[in-house]
A protein has these predicted regions:
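Outer-membrane beta-barrel proteins, especially TonB-dependent receptors
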Residues: 1-201
Length: 201
């Protein structure tokens, strides 16, 4: 979209992929799975599937000696691994919902970046910027690999460039960043019971 001194771009994409694991390389070994069923497109357990959704937008407004721009985006990464329910601990029951979902991760990412460029003279250029990102990861499945977490980061910057001619330039700047992350604790009661049965405290 372009109107006078303002222009913007928008992009969206979605990628889906489903891959089977080599029989016997994951989950419960089963000799029957080594037999060819005649269907080259048939993906049975165990398998993994990934869906990646991304939306980005860029905005820019220019007037006189000032250029203001911003980039904003959202990403959703959803990964699942499916395998016939199996466990190393005899006390772990079959899940009531999605009993064959071994692992699942749902990562949401929100990002933004804003920059203000000032052209004070033909030789001097100043840039002020701010960017931030927020992530939230949730999990499910009867196995555990990565924890749930919330992550936030942000930063401010100032950059100055001196360009006396077309062959020489000097740049200097400063940046400040701040970030936090909260990782949820994960307790595996079935593992604890198993270890206690093995004599561990």
């Amino acid at each position: 979209y372009h109107y006078k001194d303002y222009k913007s771009d928008y992009a969206i994409s979605n990628v889906f992929q489903k891959n089977g694991f080599f029989p016997g390389a994951h989950g419960i070994p089963d000799i029957s799975r080594l037999q060819d069923d005649g269907d080259s497109r048939n993906i049975e357990l165990p398998f993994s599937q990934v869906n990646h959704l991304k939306f980005t937008t860029h905005h820019q407004y220019a007037w006189e000696s000032i250029l203001l721009s911003g980039d904003f985006g959202y990403q959703n990464n959803h990964r699942e691994e499916w395998s016939a329910f199996h466990t190393h601990y005899g006390t772990q029951p079959l899940p009531e919902k999605d009993p064959d979902k071994e692992l699942a991760f749902m990562l949401h990412t929100f990002s933004s970046s804003v920059k203000l460029r000032l052209f004070g003279s033909p030789s001097w250029e100043h840039t002020a910027g701010w960017d931030s990102q927020y992530q939230q990861n949730s999990i499910s499945g009867y196995s555990f690999l990565l924890p749930e977490y919330h992550r936030f980061s942000t930063g401010l910057l100032w950059l100055t460039t001196y360009r006396p001619n077309n062959t020489f330039s000097v740049s200097g700047g400063i940046r400040y960043d701040y970030g936090t992350i909260h990782i949820s604790a994960h307790e595996d009661n079935y593992l604890a019971t198993y270890l206690e049965g093995q004599g561990y405290d």
